Amino acid sequence: MKKLTFEIRSPAHQQNAIHAVQQILPDPTKPIVVTIQERNRSLDQNRKLWACLGDVSRQVEWHGRWLDAESWKCVFTAALKQQDVVPNLAGNGFVVIGQSTSRMRVGEFAELLELIQAFGTERGVKWSDEARLALEWKARWGDRAA
C-alpha cells in the first residue's frame, strides 16, 4: 500500500480522509497504521529559522566563542527541549542528544523562533530583513502559521 497523507483544513478534507480509511480492507496479518498529528514545519519556516540563526551567529559571542548557525541551532533546540548530553565515543568531548528541527511540529517550531527572538533581542541583535519578516510572521500567526 502506498503512503497517504491528508492535510485537513476543512470538513471536505476530513471526509476525504475518512473515506480513504473506510476503503482499507483490514487484514490481521498486515496491519495498517493510521497516524493523526500536527503538521511538521514547512520549508518556509526552515528558511526563516536559518535567517534568525545567521543573525545571532554574526552578532553574539557565547562564552568567549563565536558559534556558527548550525551550532546555535543545537544550543536553541537543546534549551527548548531541555536535552541531555553524553560523552562522545573518544571520551574527549560531549554530544547533545536531542530533537531534529525537521521533525518539529508547527507549534514547536514557532516556540523555537520565539526563543531565538527573545534571546537575540536581549543581546541587542539587529535582525536582517529576512529574520525580521520571520519574527513578524511568528507574532502574527503563532501556532497557526503555515
Curated annotation (Swiss-Prot):
SUPFAM superfamilies: NinB
Pfam families: NinB
Stored InterPro entries: NinB_sf, Recombinase_NinB
UniProt family annotation: Belongs to the ninB family.
Protein name: Protein ninB
Species, as recorded: Escherichia phage lambda (Bacteriophage lambda)
Encoding gene per record: ninB
